[in-house]
Amino acid sequence: MPKDASAPRRTRKTTGKKKKDPNAPKRALSAYMFFANDNRDAIRADNPGIAFGQVGKALGEKWKTLTDAEKVPYEEKATADKKRYEDEKAAYKANAAEFDEEE
């Protein structure tokens, strides 16, 4: 039996995406992201006209072939960036707490 077409439909309210605070610190990059940022242009130069998705795939394959010793500089950068993020996040939360107390 078909439903009555004139019956009101229930609609679900969408809450939407929460706006990101522009003053919030940027997230820390992983070792792979540092590697990808350093090597993306070289992959594009070696393969002119390569599609965006294929660049990521090539970077992933190249990352997998690296030895642990070759990954060390990227892991050190990631560790330093993680510390930077944690420090900035702590300062941001402290400032947010002070701002909330003032209101």
UniProtKB/Swiss-Prot annotation:
InterPro entries: HMG_box_dom, HMG_box_dom_sf, HMGB
UniProt feature, compositional bias: Basic residues: 9-20
Coiled-coil annotated spans: none
The keyword DNA repair is assigned to this record: yes
DNA-binding region as annotated in the record: 25-93
Pfam families, sorted: HMG_box
Chief place where the protein resides: nucleus
GO cellular component: chromosome; nucleus
Subcellular location: Nucleus; Chromosome
Entry's Gene Ontology BP terms: DNA repair
Keywords: Chromosome, DNA damage, DNA repair, DNA-binding, Nucleus, Transcription, Transcription regulation
Domain of life: Eukaryota
Disordered: annotated segments: 1-27
GO MF terms held by the record: DNA binding
Reported function: DNA-binding protein that induces severe bending of DNA. Required for DNA-binding by the FACT complex, a general chromatin factor that acts to reorganize nucleosomes. The FACT complex is involved in multiple processes that require DNA as a template such as mRNA elongation, DNA replication and DNA repair. Also augments the fidelity of transcription by RNA polymerase III independently of any role in the FACT complex.
Oligomer status and interactors: Weakly associates with the stable SPT16-POB3 heterodimer to form the FACT complex.
PANTHER family: HIGH MOBILITY GROUP PROTEIN DSP1 (PTHR48112), MITOCHONDRIAL TRANSCRIPTION FACTOR A, ISOFORM B (PTHR48112:SF22)
Family according to the record: Belongs to the NHP6 family.
The protein's name in its UniProt record: Non-histone chromosomal protein 6
Lineage: Eukaryota, Fungi, Dikarya, Ascomycota, Saccharomycotina
Gene behind the chain: NHP6
